[in-house]
Amino acid sequence: MEKKDMLYEGKAKKIFGTDDKDTVVVYYKDDATAFNGEKKGTIEDKGVMNNSITSMLFELLEKKGVKTHFIEKINEREQLCKKVEIVPLEVIVRNIAAGSMAKRLGLSEGRKLDTTVFEISYKNDDLNDPLINDYHAVAIGLTTFEELKEMYSIAEKVNNTLKEFFDKQGIILVDFKIEIGRSRGGLLLADEISPDTCRLWDKKTGEKLDKDRFRRDMGNVKEAYMEILKRVNK
């Protein structure tokens, strides 16, 4: 496999082509952003940690029957992945009220929900990734109802698998967001699963072990990511 030119650079990753048109190299950066890019910073070795965490969690999910774009971890910052067309939606899964949902609905952070909540947002930086519903997504040509049904099914399987896994590591999976990619073989879980994309709280202390520490200037951000890596790697 030969790495070629950069195809795309996002907030947290760079995507490079390879000599195989069906694969890409994903490079994990140390850049940190919050509030749709309004807050910017750097977390030392974040890319290294998130690459490792994502690689291990994607391998776990593959074993549990969730198809992903992940092929292999190449080095400490890069992984080889299947090339996909990203559906321009984020699927957000919430087990406990926190973040924007708690604020939007006037709920206390940490409130248990009577059922898991599934939301979608339109991936559009200019619009600040607005929350939309299924009908919006289909009406403006982003997806189909059939595809959405499959996306929610993937999200539910990811949630069930990771909730159980993290619980065994003494971590509460509060909420997370995923991205889905279209490939010739159907839909694949893409992007990453890490403290950048999940809210993860220590089961005993309630300590936040995710990007909220950066968002809210709580300090010890690197240490929190390292703690998640340590527990995932048990």
UniProtKB/Swiss-Prot annotation:
Assigned EC number: 6.3.2.6
Organism superkingdom: Bacteria
Pfam family, one: SAICAR_synt
Keywords assigned: ATP-binding, Ligase, Nucleotide-binding, Purine biosynthesis
GO BP terms in the entry: 'de novo' IMP biosynthetic process; cobalamin biosynthetic process
Xref: SUPFAM superfamilies: SAICAR synthase-like (SSF56104)
Pathway: Purine metabolism; IMP biosynthesis via de novo pathway; 5-amino-1-(5-phospho-D-ribosyl)imidazole-4-carboxamide from 5-amino-1-(5-phospho-D-ribosyl)imidazole-4-carboxylate: step 1/2
InterPro entries: SAICAR_synt/ADE2_N, SAICAR_synt_PurC, SAICAR_synth, SAICAR_synthetase, SAICAR_synthetase_CS
Gene Ontology MF terms: ATP binding; phosphoribosylaminoimidazolesuccinocarboxamide synthase activity
Database matches in CDD domains: SAICAR_synt_PurC
Catalyzed chemical reaction(s): 5-amino-1-(5-phospho-D-ribosyl)imidazole-4-carboxylate + L-aspartate + ATP = (2S)-2-[5-amino-1-(5-phospho-beta-D-ribosyl)imidazole-4-carboxamido]succinate + ADP + phosphate + 2 H(+)
Family statement drawn from the similarity comment of this UniProt entry: Belongs to the SAICAR synthetase family.
PANTHER family: MULTIFUNCTIONAL PROTEIN ADE2, SI:DKEY-6E2.2
Descriptive protein name: Phosphoribosylaminoimidazole-succinocarboxamide synthase
Name of the gene: purC
